[in-house]
């Protein structure tokens, strides 16, 4: 009887195991928007329209406004106070 109860509980919990074991610090973030992800790096990037954004976006879809462009880590050089 106890074994049956344990098996039933495991069968109910197993489909949700990834929700329990997956943390938000891994690459497969849940509910994180590209805007939130872009705030990780500090630098100056260009939006698709070509205007500069001084909030530390990551160079993924547009080139940086900084003359040297993106570095090896695909992050814009410079800081928030840079005016290019």
UniProtKB/Swiss-Prot annotation:
GO terms for molecular function: ion channel inhibitor activity; toxin activity. Residues 20-42 form a propeptide. Disulfide bonds join 45-57, 52-65, 59-70, 64-76. It is found in: Secreted. GO terms for cellular component: extracellular region. Pfam families: Conotoxin. InterPro entries: Conotoxin. The keyword Secreted applies. Residues 1-19 form the signal peptide. The keyword Disulfide bond applies. Belongs to the conotoxin O1 superfamily. This is Mu-conotoxin-like Cal 12.2a. It comes from Californiconus californicus.
């Amino acid at each position: 009887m106890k074994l049956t109860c344990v098996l039933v509980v495991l069968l109910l919990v197993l489909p949700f195991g990834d929700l329990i074991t997956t943390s938000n610090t891994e690459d497969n973030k849940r509910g994180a928007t590209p805007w939130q992800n872009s705030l990780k790096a500090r630098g100056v990037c260009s939006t698709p329209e070509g205007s500069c954004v001084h909030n530390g976006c990551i160079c993924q879809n547009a080139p940086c406004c900084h003359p040297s462009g993106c570095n090896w880590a695909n992050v814009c050089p410079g800081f928030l106070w840079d005016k290019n």
